[in-house]
Structure formats: C-alpha cells, structure tokens
Amino acid sequence: MPSPQTDTPGPELQSPKEAEEPQTPAQGSRRTSSRKEPNAHRKDGTRLGLGSLRQAFSRASQRALTQVSKEDTGLFRRSSCSLFRSFRQALNDGPATGHSQATPEVPSGVMNGVSQQASTGAASEELKPEAEGKSVADLITERQLLAAFEQLLRLETLLVAEKASRTFEQDPTAFARRAMDVCLLYDGLAAEIGAIVRETLDSDGVDAAALAELARVVSAEEEAHPSPPDDGDFLRTPRRWRQHWEEAVRRSAQERVRRPGAGWAFGEAEGASGLAQLLAELGGLVRRDLQKVRQEVQPAYAAAGFPAWEVYLRAFHSAVAQRLQELARDARGCEQLYILLDWAANVYGSPDFLGAPGLALPAEPLPPLLAPDVWARLESDYTSFLEAKIASCFDSILQLEQSHWAAAEVPEVLQGLYQAPLSMDVHMLVAEHVKAAGAISAELEATTLRICTRALGLFVPRFEKAFLASEAVSEPHLGAYINACEELRTSLLSRFPGTQEELEKPLVTATCSFQKHLLQGLQRELQPLFRVVCTRDWLTQDWLHPLMDKVVTFAGHLQRVARPRAQETLQEVHRFVVREYLARALRPRERFRGMERMHGSQKMSLDAQAISDTFQGLGSEATWLDQAIQCVAEILGETYKDDIQRHLETLIRSYPDIRRDHILAILALRRLGRQRNQHLLQHTQDLLRAAAGAAGAEAPRGRVLFEEIKVPSAMAVLITCV
C-alpha cells in the first residue's frame, strides 16, 4: 500500500533509499514515498510519525524554529546524519549471541518513577506523547521545557526498548520516522534554549522562571545522557546542551556588542569624536548587560549550579575584543589610536568599569583585550603620529610667541616675575602627553617622554634664534624668557630626571644667550660714560651719578627675573662697571702730577665707595670686586712710597689673575722712577708667580677681572724711560 501524502508544512520522513540524503527542517520539502507498506502496523506508524513531525514544525514555538541561526541549522543536519548512521547499523545488525535486549533504565532523578513500556502495542499508543493532554511540541511552545524533556525522554526510552526487542525488523522505516520525531523534538528543545538566551538581554526584565527551567532541563539531559552508548546508537547520545547554551550566550554577546555604531566607518567628518562616541556607547551597553547578568540572570541560574556570570563575562570579553581589534585595523591618526588605547587600558580595563565593587572577575584572569602584536602595532603607530603632532605643537607655540612680538605686547608680571606663555605652553604640552601615555603603559610613557624631550631640544635653539632676530628684544622679554628657560630646566628635570642629558644643554645655552643679550644692551648704554674717567673733566664732573642711575634702572628689571639668574646677571654688571673703570684708569688719556694726582686719587676712592655701596644696595654678592679700584686709588695717592709695596701685595693676593703688565700700568700712574719701579717689580715677582698658579688652579669660578683688561705693550718702555 502506498504511503499516504500529507499537507503538513514540515518535511516527511525519508525512505531507506533516501537515508543518505537527509532533509533538514529548514528545507521544508515534502516527498511522497513510492514504497508499499507491508502491514497495517507500518501504515499506522507512518501516520503517527508524520503527525509527530507536524507537531514539531507547525506547533513548535515560532521563536525557536524561525529564528534558528546557522549554528542551529547545523545542529539539525548533524542530528539527522547521526540518526541514519544509527539506522543503517540497526538494519545491518542481526541476532547475535549474548546481545542484551533489556530495556535501558531511565535515571530516576529525571523521570521520577516513570515506568518503561516495551510492547509493540504500547509503542503505537506512545507515538504521540502527551502530558496532561499536551504534546511535546505544545510544551516546547509554552516553554515547559522540563515537562517536554521528560515526555521526550519517555519516547526515546520506549523507542530504544522497541529497537532492542527487534520490533522494527520487518518495518525499519517506521523506526526511522519515530527516531526522526525524537531527533527533531530534541533539536526543537535546543532551539528554544537558544531563543531564551537571545531574549534574556533584549527584554526589559528577566524571566527568572524560564531561565531556571532552562538550567534544570540542561542538567536533566546531562543526567539522562551521561555518556555515549557503547553501541554508538544515536538515541541516548548526549545532546551537549550545556555547550549549546554557552554558544548561545556567546552569539548573544556578539550580536549585542555589534549594535553600537553599526553603520559607523572610519574617515567620516567627525573623526576621533565619532570613534569616542562609539566606544562610549559600547562601554555603556556592556556595562548595563553585565550588571543585568550579575543582578538578575545569575541568581536565576544559581539554583542549578550554572556559572552564568563567568560564561557571560567571558562571552562579552571575547566579543568586545573582536570588535576592538576590527576597529584597530582601520584606526588612523594620533587621536583615534589614542582613543582606542585609552579605552582598552583605562575605561574597559578599569576596576570600576562595571560600576559596582561586588561585580568580581573570575578566578582565572581574562585574556588580553587586544592581542600583544595588535597592541604593539597600535603603540608604534601612535608614537609615529605623536612625533609629527608634537613637532606641530611646538611650531604653533613659536607662532603664538611671534604674534605677541608683532603686537608689541609686554610680558605679564606674575608673583613678581616676568612671565611668558612659553613656559606654561611647553609644560602643558609635555605633561599632558606624558600623563596620557602613562595611563596606558609605562613603556608608552617612556617613549612619549623621549619624543617630547627630543622635540623640545630641537625647538629651544629655533626659538632662541627667532626671538633674537626679531624686533621684540627688550629687557622685559629677555627676562621673561630667562625665567621660562630656568623654569623648564628645573621643573622638567626634577619631574623627569631622564631628560637631563637632552634638555640641560639647550636650555642652559639659551639662558646664557638671553643673559648675554641682556647685558649687552646695558653695556652699550654705559660704555660712552666711561670715556671721561681719568681726565681733567672727570676731576670736576659728577659723571658717576647718571651711570649708576642706569644700573639701578636695569636692576629693577632683574628683580623680576628668577633669583639665580638675576644674581648672576647683577654680578656681571658689577664686574663690568669695575672692569671698565680700571681699563680707563690704566690707559689714561691724561696723566696727573702733583695736586692733580692727589685729587685724582681722592676722586677714584670716592667712586670706588659709591660703586660698592650702590651694588651692595642692589643685592650684588660680588664683594670681592670692592678692593680693586680702592687699591689703585691708594697707590695713586700714597705719599709714603715704601707703603706702595704693601698695596701691591694686597692687590695681587685679592686678584690672582693680575699680570706684570697691569702692575707696570699702575706704577706708571704713580711715576715713581725707574729704580723704585724695578725694586717693586722684583719684590712682587714671586707673588705674581703664585698668583698665576692660583688663577689657573684654585681661583674661584667667575672671579676674572684683570685678565680681561688690556694695557699697552709699550708701557714697559715708558717706565724704563722714566
């Protein structure tokens, strides 16, 4: 008798000839068997088998069977293939000696006392299993998963028993149809498990009862199918629903992680801001989902001992890592690269990311969010872009300073010191980038510091050259930039000791250059005033007062310069005044005799005292300069000639850099005569040799005075003639 056709939307069971080409539920094809049924039992079995298929496909939950992913489709296909391998084995197996025909026992914890039935008549009654009037498909649709599994397990156990009793020897196709029913219903249950997992995070609330039942049915299946049967039969094979549940969790996490910025692409107008917004949305979604898992989902699974928190956490971590690595492949520019690195290290990697201290990580550490080679490439690309960005920032700082020069803006005075924006801009630039890099990794911090240091070392000479070539050179600006260089040198070197080698030299060089130009401006103003020294006009004029006024005015600017550099500059001014005075005195334009010489000595002594008092009042610490002019004045006006030797000894001991030519020039002012000059020179010869040694080895640094005073080489001839 030909098999009856059916109008059910699901596929019909295949004949044994078609077993090698199993049809999956997704195909939805209908075939009519051309084989004739040998008996009424087979006809009844065919009818009931198709009814079970109709239940599995038309009455099962649409959520479970219409939303099946590619992985679920593969599950159906693998189930069917395994089924027919088992079916072929059943056809080929004959009666064997010692073959057990006992009915497999159902675990008591699963069935709760359900009896086994092995008769052929009972099989016909059980092909459409029901519990309280509901089929397995109805129970799956209503998500009574545990009840559905218990009924399905009864059917499976009964079918195994019938197979063992050789019930289907004459009708193997009936076994195939009933086994397919079991297979499809198991897969329907698995699909419903996946649907429940997908809906868990999508809905506003959590169906705790559904999750608890899901966990119980997975545990029940594991207890019912602890290991594959020895004969390799598809029936009673472990369904691995726990792995299926974990895979569903992973797919759910991947789907949700891909939602933020689904249509966003690199290169859009918003650039880094778009990426930052995408990552902010991603972080917010992951945080909310994991909080929901911890607070609502995990408690529902906890009764069955399911490690839902660890599984969800690892699933989201893996999904975020995959999404971030995809973004990393297309990231361009310093800002985008930093945003990715910063988000991975400081946002997602923060212990406060989940927003609650109770959200603990699993005992085993999570794998790196970004693979080491990807992280290294991002850091390398970031530093490459950073070099160009830092150089561009220094160019902008120079342009900003040049705009201040062009506008003739006077530097501000803050806390009593000239202040230039240069120092603050450089500090902010270096500190900002180094701090940002340090928040990501110590290695990136060190690399960024080297980049900033190298760029600053190249910038300082460029800035110095540009400023000195401008028309803005003035005492306030020079003082402001001396302060800026000094502040950069002290603060940066103290904060980043590793920068000393690269920054010390350019900053000190620039500071000295600015000091030199500051002094040169004053020297150009004072130089003409020294021409009157040791002239007859000098004896009658108050020439020193205007000179000291200029010095005092200049010192007013130095009060707004950082003290170490201000003191150095003031001492240089002090030394310049004394040196220029002595240079004019030792090369007089006019020579005094008699009373004019005495008046000149008194005038020189008064000038020495006035110079000393003025610089002492200004705060100069170069007191070693005070005796130079005074000693020359005393030699010039000494009436007791034998005491001249004592004054020379004091002069030589106080100023080790004095030389024989300077002694000759001083003696020429006094006009002592050739014999006495020879005597004094011989007496001071040993002192001069000792002074020369001290000047070369032990003289304090910076105490140079007479060495820079040039006297005429013909002075010795003049003295000899006298």
Swiss-Prot record:
The modification Phosphoserine is found at residues 52, 513. It comes from the Eukaryota. Residues 1-53, 92-131 are annotated as: Disordered. Residues 34-46 have a biased composition (Basic and acidic residues). Belongs to the SEC6 family. The lineage of its organism: Eukaryota, Metazoa, Chordata, Craniata, Vertebrata. GO terms for biological process: exocyst localization; exocytosis. Keywords: Phosphoprotein. This is Exocyst complex component 3-like protein 4. It holds the Pfam family Sec6. GO terms for cellular component: exocyst. Residues 113-122 have a biased composition (Polar residues). InterPro entries: EXOC3/Sec6, EXOC3/Sec6_C. It comes from Homo sapiens. GO terms for molecular function: SNARE binding.
